[in-house]
């Protein structure tokens, strides 16, 4: 009866729980609707963004396509411009050749004409000098005869005078004087005629010289004009050469970049090669460890064998030797051609080293034969002939190593191992033209592994350049736990055998089956020992491939260096041609500039002289004008001073008369007393003294000024006369100089006009060149802009793709969240339905306990 009482409480709690779940479900539904709305909005926004980005990408692609079309058009224009430049270059070369030929022809004609004219002038001058000297000699002889006759006549006259015949002497003297006058006329008249003729010839010669100089100047002017006309072509050719130089420099830069890339690849190959060397060294250590273990096992088996078993082993060895010899002969016949080719490739130094290495091998093995007679039959096949030092195959080498391992002496064959290893090392060097130091201890270790034929690895002598590391020596010399166990077992067995009965020689200590099994194991061990591991062969193949790649890389580097050298040679050749052309252009320009500069200097000198004369004339004129102005000013001052003095005098006279009249007009009252009169007299006297001193001072001052002005006027008058005379002379000189300079001015104006024309043509050509360069720079800038725009478009596309991927991931996440909400709402609806259908509280509790809302992944699928 007590149970029905509390039953309504679970119902109330259950109803509350249901109400809460319904509220939660309603909230979830509202959240779901809100999320669906947000998702639809975001989806619409994403769609709009996607469409907008697609339109932007299409527009950018259209812009990029247009830019590429423009770039192609610009490239075609650039190619056309380059073709035009090539044509201009050809035209320039042809014009240069024709111009040079014409210049040489003109120079040759001018030199011939000048030489002929100089010869004619020299001949005429020489003839004139000879005739003149002859006439002078004749005249001297005539005058000497005339002087002698005159002296004789004078002596005769003196004698006659002494005799007193004065009248007759006078008549005779008159007659003789007339005769002398006639003789003088007869001599002087032809002389005057000859002098006039010589003057005429001299004027004609001077006229010819002037004509020749004028023709020479005309030819030089013509040559100068031709040089000026060709200068533009030369400048165009120089511009073409500059463009070629820039193109060649760009090619050289490209080749340098390619060479740098090849060097970088070569460095990467070297790093890979070093890594391969490291792995090879590890494999080599592993192989040496296995070899050491096999050798220890061989030694232990050899200790166990009896003398009969050793004899049988010797017989088997002899059979193997015969088979090996037969195989060796067959291989020698088959590989004869390849061996001859290899011997041709191997250097002489390698052959000498192989012969030297074979000699100590034979000596060492003879020493072994003399010391250890029991193993003579085993060591006899190791003496290699000097003509075929590399004829053994790898299998033969490992068989020999097996036989060496079965001998009693472990120290006798280290020199043979060294010589074989050296021989293989030299062969490797000759094959790849590489030094052993390029590969380190790896190649030496490989040669040792291929030619291993000794027992004691502790006494092993490696080839030059190879040294075992401490870890390798420790790994070779150390014993494994299994080896220690076998060594202890063998030591116990040998001690038991020493204490036990020793069987006579020829009897076996083991059975036949055990012996056969032992022989098989030995044979298998020998085969395993002679067979190379797959890892080593793979490493060797990789090493060969790397060597081939390195050789190809070196060949490529050599080719690139050759191409770079050819490009540099071509660049130097073009630079040399350009330098020669520039030198010729400079020489021609210097010649023309020298001629122009000479004329310009003359014109400048005349202009300077004219300017100096004008300046001196203007300076003298200014000085005279200044002096005249000073004189006029001083004159005006003197006249003003004179007027002022006259006015002062007049004013003083007027003032005096005025004062007198005033005094007379005033009612002058005489003093009454003597004292007052005395004071008045003293006062007047003082005033009179003051007036007199002032008048004296003024008079002296005026006299001094008048004298100074008179002297100044006289000096200025003299200076004026001197200046007028000097200025008159300078004016006359200036007129003469102006008359001489006017012609030079006209010539200078003509030269300036020609120079201006040349400068204008040069300026036009330079402007054309600058326009072409600007066009080239604009094209390059446009190309750079287009490439930059392309890069930016690609970057933008990449960013848009990333953005689209990010939006896609967000969309996927939102879809997953929506699915989770849907899943959760469905689960809650199912649970509510199950709760509604539940018939008891325990069932509801079980349903609620089974429901786990901590993880969405744990919800069951509905």
Curated annotation (Swiss-Prot):
SUPFAM superfamilies cross-referenced by the UniProt entry: G protein-binding domain
Sorted UniProt keywords: Acetylation, Apoptosis, Coiled coil, Cytoplasm, Cytoplasmic vesicle, Endocytosis, Endosome, Phosphoprotein, Protein transport, Transport
PTM comment text: Proteolytic cleavage by caspases in apoptotic cells causes loss of endosome fusion activity.
Keyword Nucleus: no
Modified residues (N-acetylalanine): 2
Bias type Basic and acidic residues, positions: 336-345
Residues found modified as N6-acetyllysine: 282
Signal peptide range: none
Residues the record lists as Phosphoserine modifications: 374, 377, 407, 410
InterPro entries on file: Rabaptin (IPR003914), Rabaptin_coiled-coil (IPR018514), Rabaptin_Rab5-bd_dom (IPR015390)
Family: Belongs to the rabaptin family.
Subunit structure: Heterodimer with RABGEF1. The heterodimer binds RAB4A and RAB5A that have been activated by GTP-binding. Interacts with TSC2. Interacts with GGA1 (via GAE domain), GGA2 (via GAE domain) and GGA3 (via GAE domain). Interacts with AP1G1 (via GAE domain). Interacts with AP1G2 (via GAE domain). Interacts with ECPAS. Interacts with KCNH1. Interacts with PKD1 (via C-terminal domain) and GGA1; the interactions recruit PKD1:PKD2 complex to GGA1 and ARL3 at trans-Golgi network. Interacts with KCNH1.
Stated role: Rab effector protein acting as linker between gamma-adaptin, RAB4A and RAB5A. Involved in endocytic membrane fusion and membrane trafficking of recycling endosomes. Involved in KCNH1 channels trafficking to and from the cell membrane. Stimulates RABGEF1 mediated nucleotide exchange on RAB5A. Mediates the traffic of PKD1:PKD2 complex from the endoplasmic reticulum through the Golgi to the cilium.
Protein known as: Rab GTPase-binding effector protein 1
Organism name: Mus musculus (Mouse)
């Amino acid at each position: 009866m007590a149970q029905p009482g509390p039953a309504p409480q679970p119902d109330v709690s259950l109803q509350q729980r249901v109400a809460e779940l319904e509220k939660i479900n309603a909230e979830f539904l509202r959240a779901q609707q809100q999320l669906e709305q947000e998702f639809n909005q975001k989806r619409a926004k994403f769609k709009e963004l996607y469409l907008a980005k697609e339109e932007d990408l299409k527009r950018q692609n259209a812009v990029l396509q247009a830019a590429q079309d423009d770039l192609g058009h610009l490239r075609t224009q650039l190619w056309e411009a380059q073709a035009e430049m090539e044509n201009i270059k050809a035209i320039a070369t042809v014009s240069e050749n024709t111009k040079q030929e014409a210049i040489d022809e003109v120079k040759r004609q001018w030199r011939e004409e000048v030489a002929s004219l100089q010869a004619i002038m020299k001949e005429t001058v020489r003839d004139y000098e000879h005739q003149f000297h002859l006439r002078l000699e004749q005249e001297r002889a005539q005058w000497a005869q005339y002087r002698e006759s005159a002296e004789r006549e004078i002596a005769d006259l003196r004698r006659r005078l002494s005799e007193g015949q004065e009248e007759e002497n006078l008549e005779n003297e008159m007659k003789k004087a007339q005769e002398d006058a006639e003789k003088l006329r007869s001599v002087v008249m032809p002389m005057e005629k000859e002098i006039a003729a010589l003057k005429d010839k001299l004027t004609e010669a001077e006229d010819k010289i002037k004509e020749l100089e004028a023709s020479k100047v005309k030819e030089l002017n013509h040559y100068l004009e031709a040089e000026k006309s060709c200068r533009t072509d030369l400048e165009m050719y120089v511009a073409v050469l500059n463009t070629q130089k820039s193109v060649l420099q760009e090619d050289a830069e490209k080749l340098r970049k390619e060479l740098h890339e090849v060097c970088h690849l070569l460095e990467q190959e070297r790093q890979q090669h070093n890594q391969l060397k490291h792995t090879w060294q590890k494999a080599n250590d592993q192989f040496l460890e296995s070899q050491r273990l096999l050798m220890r096992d061989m030694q232990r088996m050899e200790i166990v064998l009896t003398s009969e078993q050793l004899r049988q082993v010797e017989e088997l060895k002899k059979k193997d030797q015969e088979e090996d010899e037969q195989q060796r002969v067959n291989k020698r016949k088959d590989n004869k051609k390849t061996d001859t080719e290899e011997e041709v490739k191997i250097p002489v130094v390698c052959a000498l080293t192989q012969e030297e290495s074979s000699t100590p091998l034979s000596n060492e093995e003879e020493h072994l034969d003399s010391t250890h007679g029991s193993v003579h039959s085993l060591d006899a096949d190791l003496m290699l002939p000097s003509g075929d030092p590399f004829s053994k195959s790898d299998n033969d080498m490992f068989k020999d190593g097996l036989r060496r391992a079965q001998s009693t002496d472990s120290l006798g064959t280290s020199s043979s191992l060294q010589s074989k290893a050296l021989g293989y090392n030299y062969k490797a060097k000759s094959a790849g033209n590489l030094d052993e130091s390029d590969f380190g201890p790896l190649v030496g270790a490989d040669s040792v592994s291929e030619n291993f034929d000794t027992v004691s690895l502790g006494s092993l002598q490696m080839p030059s350049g190879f040294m075992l590391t401490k870890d390798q020596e420790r790994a070779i010399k150390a014993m494994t736990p299994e080896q220690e166990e076998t060594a202890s077992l063998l030591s116990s067995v040998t001690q038991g055998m020493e204490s036990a009965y020793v069987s006579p020689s020829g009897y076996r200590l083991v059975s036949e089956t055990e012996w056969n099994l032992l022989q098989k194991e030995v044979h298998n061990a020998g085969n395993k020992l002679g067979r190379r591991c797959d890892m080593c062969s793979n490493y060797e193949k990789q090493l060969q491939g790397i060597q081939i790649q390195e050789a190809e890389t070196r060949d490529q580097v050599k080719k690139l260096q050759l191409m770079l050298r050819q490009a540099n040679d071509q660049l130097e050749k073009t630079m040399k041609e350009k330098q020669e052309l520039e030198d010729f252009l400079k020489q021609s320009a210097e010649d023309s500039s020298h001629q122009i500069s000479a004329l310009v200097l003359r014109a400048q000198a005349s202009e300077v002289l004219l300017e100096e004369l004008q300046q001196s004339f203007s300076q003298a004129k200014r000085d005279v004008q200044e002096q005249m102005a000073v004189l006029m000013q001083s004159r005006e001052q003197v006249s003003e001073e004179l007027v002022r003095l006259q006015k002062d005098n007049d004013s003083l006279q007027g003032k005096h008369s005025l004062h007198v009249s005033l005094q007379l007009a005033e009612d002058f009252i005489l003093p009454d007393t003597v004292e007052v009169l005395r004071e008045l007299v003293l006062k007047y006297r003082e005033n009179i003294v003051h007036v007199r001193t002032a008048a004296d001072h003024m008079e002296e001052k005026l006299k001094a000024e008048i004298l100074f002005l008179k002297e100044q006027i006289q000096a200025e008058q003299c200076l004026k006369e001197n200046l007028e005379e000097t200025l008159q002379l300078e004016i006359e000189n200036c007129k003469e100089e102006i008359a001489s300079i006017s012609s030079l001015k006209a010539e200078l104006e003509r030269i300036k006009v020609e120079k201006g024309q040349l400068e204008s043509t040069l300026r036009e050509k330079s402007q054309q060149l600058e326009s072409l360069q600007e066009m080239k720079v604009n094209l390059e800038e446009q190309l750079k802009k287009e490439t930059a725009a392309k890069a930016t478009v690609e970057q933008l596309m990449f960013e848009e793709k990333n953005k689209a991927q990010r939006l896609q991931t967000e969309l996927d996440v939102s879809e997953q969240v929506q699915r989770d909400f849907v899943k959760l709402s469905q689960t809650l609806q199912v649970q509510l339905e199950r709760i509604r259908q539940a018939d008891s509280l325990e069932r509801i509790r079980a349903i609620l306990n089974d429901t786990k809302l901590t993880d969405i992944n744990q919800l069951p699928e509905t």
